[in-house]
Amino acid sequence: MDEEYEVIVLGTGLKECILSGLLSVDGVKVLHMDRNDYYGGESTSLNLNQLWKKFRGEEKAPEHLGASRDYNVDMMPKFMMGNGKLVRTLIHTDVTKYLSFKAVDGSYVFVKGKVQKVPATPMEALKSSLMGIFEKRRAGKFFSFVQEYDEKDPKTHDGMDLTRVTTKELIAKYGLDGNTIDFIGHAVALHTNDQHLDQPAFDTVMRMKLYAESLARFQGTSPYIYPLYGLGELPQAFARLSAVYGGTYMLNKPECKVEFDEGGKVIGVTSEGETAKCKKIVCDPSYLPNKVRKIGRVARAIAIMSHPIPNTNDSHSVQVIIPQKQLARKSDMYVFCCSYSHNVAPKGKFIAFVSTDAETDNPQTELKPGTDLLGPVDEIFFDMYDRYEPVNEPELDNCFISTSYDATTHFETTVADVLNMYTLITGKQLDLSVDLSAASAAEE
Amino acid sequence: MSDDDERGEEYLFKIVIIGDSAVGKSNLLTRYARNEFNPNSKATIGVEFQTQSMLIDGKEVKAQIWDTAGQERFRAVTSAYYRGAVGALVVYDITRSSTFENVGRWLDELNTHSDTTVAKMLIGNKCDLESIRAVSVEEGKSLAESEGLFFMETSALDSTNVKTAFEMVIREIYSNISRKQLNSDSYKEELTVNRVSLVKNENEGTKTFSCCSR
């Protein structure tokens, strides 16, 4: 370990592993360490015994739940947008060859006290039971405008400059009612709160297009895909990419103390009495607690069940978004479910998650509207965890710290953080647009 | 990749090679796949997996053989590496007894992460170095017997037994899978529903047993 590296990466969460992979491919000499004896950090997937140890403090789970290794329970439940940034990163790096994916069965929204399918195209809007007959036609027109909208073609702009017009003004033009605005903003554009209504509509329109294009891509019934064996496979796949390009991997390294010179610049990392020298550090917030600040808290529930979520057409994988307003909250609540058909549980078992930005200290009560949708559960765990963001200046200390994973339901913000860090570290932009053609070529 | 009924079907098996650093895992693989040997190869860099085909019962059987990419050096092989592996070669160096003593730990790791492995072989590599041998053939044999593994000594340097060892594992997988297949089709069908491909699949119509044979 007493060697010199250009970059030492601490923590094997998804963000750190993508960066490690990209840097190694660039020819950078990387050492990647984790204090845990498993990959994935906060974004790992746990087997049943690991899950019991974390939440119940016991080493062994009850036998009736099946074999421990048949479980891969995501600690950071999210789905991947079929046409999103993570998919493009996977294709760009060719990491797809280590992974298998399945389309997610269903995308639902909780509106007016009911779980209902999310319509995302003019056709679907007309069939949806979410809206009355006149509202459907208005929504259909709005979806058509979004589908046609092309940034570069003023003819499709309908006389509006979307970088100036707010989302509220755009929606007013189509005369949509409150519930429609709610499901479009939260379940299609996937905003986590209502701030977008007062911001330029461009972002919301692009998000709606991403949703619709992702939906069209695999001709599935949702815009999402999900890797077999759980999300914990993603960091491991990028770690393999890094290793194939010469990255050195060490797990189970206690302490991992970052060392600085008198000027405050990083010089290396010490673990078990040995110091590896480096020019730069890339890490998650837990490795440099003095250089981050708390920005929020997430409340979550993890349930093991023997049935799919009721009212979701028996979907083996599904997302249900509960917009804040439907519960008179400040932030949305998210319900996920996946099952044995994704190799994350033994045959017949389902894993469901409910999560939200915490507004109280009692996750059990706060998450009840979400857990009520699950029906009977075999086991359920509640907990809360803090979220952090860096406050250091990387140009002064050469430390590049990722932001904790947010409560969004997909990986768009995760990859945006990674791309931003990549630019800070290397001074280069990672161009993912070139892969668009490759991505669409894969449409079948 | 779902058209299982197509005629002229192919088989694709995932096989992993495990064992301590510098026992010759990569050289075994390149000797088998490309008939090459690099005496100066340091820790593995740039090796992914190699795909080799052989004919069994008139059917083309492909083996996708994975190398550890050097992650075994500090015992950081990913659990994903073992996913869906149907065959495994556990390699030690006959001139270094520590690599033989660690075989048990590698088997534990394999069993923790994979329940799909139907053919396992213990390999004592570098048998061309008879003069500095530290592990006897009998010791290798008896460990293999007690753990239920095939056993062979090989030399990636002079090619001894390399092809034989890989082909024995592939044949064993094939005969196991063909038998198992009769009973498992319905469950497998269920598991392949909604499968999506992010890239054009070169092996369209290929049966992948890497993740469907659970």
UniProtKB/Swiss-Prot annotation, chain A:
It comes from the Eukaryota. Keywords: GTPase activation. GO terms for biological process: protein transport; small GTPase-mediated signal transduction. It holds the Pfam family GDI. GO terms for cellular component: apoplast; cytosol; plasmodesma. GO terms for molecular function: GTPase activator activity; Rab GDP-dissociation inhibitor activity. Expressed in roots and floral buds. Belongs to the Rab GDI family. Regulates the GDP/GTP exchange reaction of most RAB proteins by inhibiting the dissociation of GDP from them, and the subsequent binding of GTP. This is Guanosine nucleotide diphosphate dissociation inhibitor 2. It comes from Arabidopsis thaliana (Mouse-ear cress). The gene is GDI2.
Swiss-Prot record, chain B:
Induction: By abscisic acid (ABA), phosphate (Pi) deprivation, cold, sucrose, mannose, and water stress. SUPFAM superfamilies: P-loop containing nucleoside triphosphate hydrolases. InterPro entries: P-loop_NTPase, Rab_GTPases_membrane_traffic, Small_GTP-bd, Small_GTPase. Changing residue 125 to I: Decreases GTP-binding efficiency. The keyword Transferase does not apply. The keyword Glycoprotein does not apply. A motif (Effector region) lies at residues 41-49. A lipid is attached at residues 211-212 (S-geranylgeranyl cysteine). GO terms for molecular function: GTP binding; GTPase activity. Keywords: Cell membrane, Golgi apparatus, GTP-binding, Lipoprotein, Membrane, Nucleotide-binding, Prenylation. It is a lipid-anchor. GO terms for biological process: inter-Golgi cisterna vesicle-mediated transport; response to heat. GTP binds at residues 19-26, 67-71, 125-128, 155-156. It is found in: Golgi apparatus membrane; Golgi apparatus, trans-Golgi network membrane; Cell membrane. Expressed in roots and actively dividing cells. One of its GO terms (cellular component) is Golgi stack. Belongs to the small GTPase superfamily. Rab family. Intracellular vesicle trafficking and protein transport. Binds GTP and GDP and possesses intrinsic GTPase activity. Interacts (via C-terminus) with GDI1. Interacts with PUX8/SAY1. This is Ras-related protein RABA5c. It comes from Arabidopsis thaliana.
